[in-house]
Amino acid sequence: MDIAHDLQSIGAQEQALVFPHFDPARAWALGNRMHALAASRGHAVAIDIATFGHPLFFSALPGATPDNADWVRRKRNVVAHFRRSSYAIGLRMQQAGTTLTDKHGLPLAEYAPHGGAFPLTVAGAGVIGSVTVSGLPQRLDHEFVVETLCAELGQDYGVLALARS
């Protein structure tokens, strides 16, 4: 895995995956799409869609644990703080050889710079929340979110997917 290349690719994902509008009905549709895909693949994940301070969708598939819900919360906090995907922030910390605590004073009990939380961006409004998955290895959590956002927004996942590691 080339961190610099992944960071560039994640930046392209964040630029491309923008909703023209977003409301609770769209959150429900996206959440159900994610749930159905995760169930079809046998993924034991927790799925969360929220605007900042307002939960819109949550689902825990069979095999997901309360730990997954806590990871969701901590990853979501990273997006809320940085307005970037949690995976991008984690890779930036890895690249710099530091941690969120050392660099930004953010406690790891509240912030998880691991893949799986992606900014929910609306054209003309910016980042309004996050779409988060927890239960797979972090790169796969991130890519699962990107794949389903691509499907929801009519984007070509093959173009936006991270390089295979």
Swiss-Prot record:
SUPFAM superfamilies: GlcG-like. InterPro entries: PduO/GlcC-like, PduO/GlcC-like_sf, YBR137W-like. It comes from the Bacteria. Coiled coil: none annotated. Belongs to the UPF0303 family. HAMAP family: UPF0303. This is UPF0303 protein Bmul_1674/BMULJ_01570. The lineage of its organism: Bacteria, Pseudomonadati, Pseudomonadota, Betaproteobacteria, Burkholderiales.
